[in-house]
From Swiss-Prot:
It comes from the Bacteria. Transmembrane segments: none annotated. Forms a cylinder of 14 subunits composed of two heptameric rings stacked back-to-back. Interacts with the co-chaperonin GroES. Disulfide bonds: none annotated. Together with its co-chaperonin GroES, plays an essential role in assisting protein folding. The GroEL-GroES system forms a nano-cage that allows encapsulation of the non-native substrate proteins and provides a physical environment optimized to promote and accelerate protein folding. One of its GO terms (cellular component) is cytoplasm. Coiled coil: none annotated. This is Chaperonin GroEL.
């Protein structure tokens, strides 16, 4: 396919038009008085959102060169979202400001490489200054404040704070759509995995169709059990103790399953058989997790262990097990706390090392199951459109809160970026490097300018006053007051602000050093591919 090539000034100008198109659509959503953007969906109702990355991903421009500019800025939003989970609109605003200012200077004759060096120096100092003014997040109230600001909803803030308190900072918090109108929190204590009983005859509560085992023994094996003789010796030992048994195996079928069911129905012995969770290597890892949590040994030929010679001291214990048709929940496993802690640290290390998003998600699920439990926020709304928008906001708020727990918080509302202004301005440089530093200085003001603009105010007045205020004091655009931002709970996670600045600078530096842009030439539609003209089928009149 033929290519279209543009060079230097012409190339950068074309891309800038794309940058502006995307950034102008995204930045109207910034701040407490930000507006919404409506996105057309080919199927179903349109999506109304104020989430920067969602808007950025939807934008596709007709002109190939403009589209490349738009995609560069969309990458800033996407990368910030991946790293910090929020701050995508701020990142987009920063990137647009740096690219615009940079392009003015490069057009006027500045050397892009020198400008890039200045930008990198300024951002490094700004990031260090952000870390210095960052405060650690402590207590449920602080967590609720961060979540409330991100979701623009105090109810959501308190729900997320409660969820994190219940399952711990590493716990899995999932967000699901609810059938009702209200948004609720449901917490599953202990370890839950998605495998239910092997036979419905094993239930102890026929109304709820669930089997509840109090203080059971737990047998964990990776074998398929078909013959009752294999597990008879250990069954007899458990019967003597008068306790129920949870049997986790690759599968339990045939005579073995029938015998367990018959004994349950006769009231002789209560046992519930469950298939092992996961597949392949993940199954092996999850069985080990269960064994460590309950204090069991995994009966596997890999370790030279045989079911027939299994003793009762090789089984695990738990205070309670609840098995439904689809899930098994083990509450208060009797495993050694030191071994559980070591396993948690091992999984944490694997999370840090893995590059696969899927593997990371699965490892974090395992981590949560060992470390505390799973919380589910069930999102409710009156209409499907409102439900989608609300779910997106809650996801952002959750990511934002996790980022705050990780690296602390700074003053929100664009205040923190202006707070580091003086440190960056104190940098000594000359020539094009100084130009690069000045570009970053101008960009640091842009988020607060945009927040003020969205609230119907003059940004320059707010920025100039903010530079003279003490660190932490800022403008609350929601109420129109000057307040101590952290005291009032108007905060941003340091990680979000840092990531937005670093990613914006990275793309701006690449943009300014671009000297040629190559795109596919649009194909001309010659109209020759269709059916030949048949003259309105008039020539076929003789066939009547």
């Amino acid at each position: 396919m033929a290519k279209d090539i543009k060079f230097s000034e012409e190339a950068r100008r074309s891309m800038l038009r794309g940058v502006d198109a995307l950034a102008d659509a995204v930045k109207v959503t910034l701040g407490p008085k930000g507006r919404n953007v409506v996105l057309e969906k080919k199927f179903g109702s349109p999506l109304i959102t104020n989430d920067g990355v969602t808007i950025a991903k939807e934008i596709e421009l007709e002109d190939a060169f403009e589209n490349m500019g738009a995609k560069l800025v969309a990458e800033v939003a996407s990368k910030t979202n991946d790293v910090a989970g929020d701050g995508t609109t701020t990142a987009t605003v920063l990137a647009q400001a740096m690219i615009r200012e940079g392009l003015k200077n490069v057009t006027a004759g500045a050397n892009p490489v020198g400008v890039r060096k200045g930008i990198e120096q300024a951002v490094a100092v700004a990031v260090e200054s952000l870390k210095e003014i960052s405060k650690p997040i402590e207590g449920k109230e602080s967590i609720a404040q961060v979540a409330s600001i991100s979701a623009a909803d105090e109810e959501v803030g308190s729900l997320i704070a409660e969820a994190m308190e219940r399952v711990g900072n590493d716990g899995v918090i999932t967000i699901e759509e609810s059938k009702g109108f209200t948004t609720e929190l449901e917490v599953v204590e202990g370890m839950q995995f998605d495998r239910g009983y092997a036979s419905p005859y094993m239930v102890t509560d026929s109304d709820k169709m669930e089997a509840v085992l109090e203080n059971p023994y737990i047998l964990v094996t990776d074998k398929k059990i078909t013959n009752i003789q294999e597990i008879l010796p250990v069954l007899e030992q458990v019967v003597q103790q008068g306790k129920p048994l949870l049997l986790i195996a690759e599968d339990v079928e045939g005579e073995a399953l029938a015998t367990l069911v018959v004994n349950k129905l006769r009231g002789t012995f209560n046992a519930v058989a469950v298939k092992a969770p996961g597949f392949g290597d993940r199954r092996k890892a999850m069985l080990e997790d269960i064994s460590i949590l309950t204090g069991a040994e995994v009966i596997t030929e890999d370790l030279g262990l045989d079911l027939k010679s299994t003793q009762i001291n090789q089984l695990g214990r738990a205070s309670k097990v609840v098995v439904t048709k689809e899930n098994t929940t083990i509450v208060e496993g009797a495993g050694d706390t030191e071994q559980i802690a070591a396993r948690v640290n091992q999984i944490r290390a694997q999370v840090e090392e893995t590059t696969s998003e899927f593997d990371k998600e699965k490892l974090q699920e395992r981590l949560a199951k060992l470390a505390g439990g799973v919380a589910v926020i069930k999102v409710g709304a009156a209409t499907e459109t409102e439900l989608k928008e609300r779910k997106l906001r809650i996801e952002d708020a959750l990511n934002s809160t996790r980022a705050a727990v990780e690296e602390g918080i700074v003053s929100g509302g664009g205040t923190a970026l202006v707070n580091v202004y003086n440190k960056v301005a104190a940098l000594e440089a000359e020539g094009d490097e100084l130009t690069g530093i000045n570009i970053v200085l101008r960009a640091l003001e842009e988020p607060i300018r945009q927040i003020a603009h969205n609230a119907g105010l003059e940004g320059s007045v707010i920025v100039e006053r903010l530079k003279n205020e003490e660190i932490g004091v800022g403008y609350n655009a929601a109420t129109g007051e000057w307040v101590n931002m952290i005291d009032k709970g108007i905060v941003d996670p340091t990680k979000v602000t840092r990531s937005a600045l670093q990613n914006a600078a990275s793309v701006a530096a690449m943009f300014l050093t671009t000297e040629a842009v190559v795109a596919d030439k649009p194909e001309e539609n010659k109209g020759g591919a269709g059916m030949p003209d048949m003259g309105g089928m008039g020539g076929m009149g003789g066939m009547m």
